[in-house]
Design a protein with these regions (language model features):
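Conserved beta-hairpin
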Residues: 9-20
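Conserved acetyl-CoA-binding loop-helix of GNAT-fold acetyltransferases
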Residues: 44-56
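A short, internal acetyl-CoA/4′-phosphopantetheine-binding micro-motif in the GNAT/acyltransferase core
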Residues: 36-43
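Conserved GNAT acetyl-CoA-binding A-motif
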Residues: 57-71
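Active-site rim helix/loop that mediates acceptor-substrate recognition in acyltransferases
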Residues: 1-10
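Residue-level signal for tight coil/turn positions that link beta-strands
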Residues: 8, 27-29
Length: 79
């Protein structure tokens, strides 16, 4: 089972104590800029799981997401 872990400027996807993906972001004013999305195993939905976590975190903390990386852009276009 994949666990989401929030750290400063990073959201990690962990499985069996191993990082299987991460999002790197920056915060400024009311904006959360998604800089990079990494999923170390493709086809498992890890990137989407991370983006879902980022969207939820941004909403809870009243940030607007600015998708810098192409994965974040494509994910948000679908929503």
């Amino acid at each position: 089972m994949i666990e989401i872990v929030y750290q400063e400027a990073t959201i990690l996807a962990m499985e069996n104590d191993k990082v299987v993906g991460k999002i790197e972001f920056s915060l400024a004013d009311i904006e959360m800029s998604i800089l990079h999305t990494y999923a170390y195993e493709s086809g498992r939905g890890i990137g989407s799981l991370l983006m879902q976590a980022a969207v939820e975190w941004a909403g809870e903390h009243k940030y607007t997401i600015v998708p810098i990386c192409t994965f974040a852009q494509k994910y948000l276009e679908k929503k």
